UniProtKB/Swiss-Prot annotation:
Region (Disordered) location: 1-31, 250-355, 623-658
Phosphoserine: residues bearing it: S93, S97, S252
Record-given protein name: Large subunit GTPase 1 homolog
Source species: Homo sapiens (Human)
Highest taxon of the lineage: Eukaryota
């Protein structure tokens, strides 16, 4: 049985309550001479939409403050401001980039790392920790003022004091401090103030820049960087951690692997160098010395690869140097303002026994690297009878891979996350040679935009909010023909009213890539954010190779790999034309005449089956006579309906989608 309905008089109470509520609401906002107890002179705590506000957005906070202050705002119709297409890409114009570069040069002396305060045997641990905290706090305030006053963008830097303490201890214990940088952009990962701080602690300590992933550079590019750092009076070594474990075999192997890397391989192959070019470069840059043999000694034994973790209690056993022996911080910052010639002369006066620096441009092997470490430091060592080499670098430049390659097996876990290594470690390669591994530190440096930080691998790609600026930077650095040859896509060409040599936009690249890979959204459009993550990861890994040139060089002519790929493409096109082959059809161009004069046939589209067993939709009721006559003409059930099969509309009108 159904539910028993309530009698009609049961809703009288609700009707009276509803009437009383409506009556009170109607008289609440009307003036009346009658006496009433509802004065409406207080806050209405009984309303239903009462909410507690503990956090507001910037706009809501501004409007709420203006309402409390009794300020009213009136909309004004001002002049219209047109936003150009370049502003939507998130990239800077040429004038803006030049202005930011000038600001970077003017404020370079303020970009420093925190110093360890002076201490001696009478300093208590509590006093030392408090002094370190005070210096670290003042250093962070200085960087914040630099960002706010000069409107500059700094890379994310390490904000944990414990990691900087590990750096201080590594510098104190090391005879040679090695900065590991990425070969594609060495100046971004180089910290000049760290080199100054090493000389402040002890003039006998040596600075070396180890350019990792140097197999991504050509011989001409390595020579250009070697000459640049030689003018800067900085010792550099070209090295590849992944290729260092493989013996160098010959010229043909280098060319084959370099071509494979430029033709869509993401792994680094065997790296080698031209013997004739090496001998020529060594005759120009290197003094006459015996070249170390390339035979590698086994280092997998437990005695040769002894591992030791240095606890903090052993700090008193090491010889430490205070900042009183070296120049002050102001003097060091003043030296960086001067030219490189004056800087080298000041260093030569400070250390007259120092040799003239000569850099060579070939890739060194593992044994050559160890021999260079032994020959580089000839002064007084921190620990008698032992050469200590401290390795410092960003977490994603290959520091851990370098250590594992030198040791011959996996001694340090490889990770791209800052803070993976909590404490410095000492790794004995052989008797008398010790590697001191410092935790990965992200040091402050200048960048122009966040897109540059994402493309350099500093910011994680999976956590980016806006994919348009980084992909626009990739399109600006990588030519159109390289993108098309790498991914096998056809990017839409510019319109007739545009520059035919302009770089493709991010939307054009991501749309073509998404269509080719099948990355589509629920609405049938190419998934641009997903395509952007794949392209940016290929750019960071080196599949899309772009090498930043030294200052003063043209970035376009410095990309020899792009020029070689273009020449190969032109040669292949000429061969195809000679053989009489048809060239691959290009994507439909945005031609104004074709679009304007193209006439489409207007037709009606139906949904469903066109004909079933001889019946056509809209032909009316099928009688027995008509059915028999049609069946007599043939056997339609054996024709399968393939002759007049209905095509999908998206296939018929595919040319209208783009």
């Amino acid at each position: 049985m159904g539910r028993r309905r309530a009698p009609a008089g049961g809703s009288l109470g609700r009707a009276l309550m509803r009437h009383q509520t409506q009556r009170s609401r109607s008289h609440r906002h009307t003036d009346s001479w009658l006496h009433t107890s509802e004065l409406n002179d207080g806050y209405d705590w009984g309303r239903l939409n009462l909410q507690s506000v503990t956090e507001q957005s910037s706009l809501d906070d501004f409007l709420a403050t203006a309402e409390l202050a009794g300020t009213e705002f009136v909309a004004e119709k001002l002049n219209i401001k047109f936003v150009p297409a370049e502003a939507r890409t998130g990239l800077l114009s040429f004038e803006e980039s030049q202005r930011i570069k000038k600001l970077h040069e003017e404020n370079k002396q303020f970009l420093c790392i925190p110093r360890r305060p002076n201490w001696n045997q009478n300093t208590t641990p509590e006093e030392l920790k408090q002094a370190e905290k005070d210096n670290f706090l003042e250093w962070r305030r200085q960087l914040v003022r630099l960002e706010e006053e000069q409107k500059l963008i700094l890379t994310p830097f390490e904000r944990n004091l414990d990691f900087w303490r590990q750096l201080w201890r590594v510098i104190e214990r090391s005879d040679i401090v090695v900065q590991i940088v990425d070969a594609r952009n060495p100046l971004l990962f180089r910290c000049e103030d760290l080199e100054c701080y090493v000389k402040e602690m002890d003039a006998n300590k040596e600075n070396v820049i180890l350019i990792n992933k140097a197999d991504l550079l050509t011989a001409e590019q390595r020579s250009a960087w070697a000459m640049y750092f030689e003018k800067e009076d900085v010792k550099v070594i070209f090295w590849s951690a992944l290729a260092g474990a493989i013996p160098l075999n010959g010229d043909s192997e280098e060319e084959a692997n370099r071509d494979d890397r430029q033709s869509n391989t993401t792994k680094f192959g065997h790296s080698s160098f031209d013997q004739a070019e090496i001998s020529h470069s060594e005759s120009e840059h290197l003094p006459a010395r015996d070249s170390p043999s390339l035979s590698e000694n086994p280092t997998t034994d437990e005695d040769d690869s002894e591992y030791e973790d240095c606890p903090e209690e052993e700090e008193d056993d090491w010889q430490t140097c205070s900042e009183e022996d070296g120049p002050k911080e102001e003097d060091c910052s003043q030296d960086w303002k001067e030219s490189s010639t004056a800087d080298s002369e000041a260093r030569s006066r400070k250390t007259p026994q120092k040799r003239q620096i000569h850099n060579f441009s070939h890739l060194v092997s593992k044994q050559e690297l160890l021999e260079l470490f032994k020959e580089l430091h000839t002064g007084r060592k921190v620990k008698d009878g032992q050469l200590t080499v401290g390795l410092v670098g960003y977490p994603n430049v290959g520091k851990s891979s370098t250590i594992n390659t030198i040791m011959g097996n996996k001694k340090v876990s490889v990770s791209a996350t800052p803070g993976h290594t909590k404490h410095f470690q000492t790794l004995y390669v052989e008797p008398g040679l010790c590697l001191c591994d410092c935790p990965g530190l992200v040091m402050p440096s200048f960048v122009s935009t966040k897109a540059e930080m994402t493309c350099s691998g500093i910011l994680p790609i999976d956590q980016m909010r806006d994919h348009v600026p980084p992909v626009s930077l990739v399109c600006q650095n990588i030519p159109r023909h390289v993108l098309e040859a790498t991914y096998g896509i056809n990017i839409i060409t510019p319109r007739e009213d545009e520059d035919p040599h302009r770089p493709p936009t991010s939307e054009e690249l991501l749309t073509a890539y998404g269509y080719m890979r099948g990355f589509m959204t629920a609405h049938g459009q190419p998934d641009q954010p997903r395509s952007a993550r794949y392209i940016l990861k290929d750019y960071v890994s080196g599949k899309l190779l772009y090498c930043h040139p030294p200052p003063g060089r043209d970035p376009v002519t410095f990309q020899h790999q792009h020029q070689r790929l273009l020449e190969n493409k032109m040669n292949s096109d000429e061969i195809k034309m000679q053989l009489g082959r048809n060239k691959k059809a290009k994507q439909i161009e945005n031609i104004v005449d074709k679009t304007f004069f193209h006439q489409e046939n207007v037709r009606a589209l139906t949904k469903g089956v066109q004909a079933v067993m001889g019946y056509k939709p809209g032909s009316g009721v099928v009688t027995a006579s008509t059915a028999s006559s049609e069946n007599g003409a043939g056997k339609p059930w054996k024709k399968h309906g393939n002759r007049n099969k209905k095509e999908k509309s998206r296939r018929l009108y595919k040319h209208l989608d783009m």
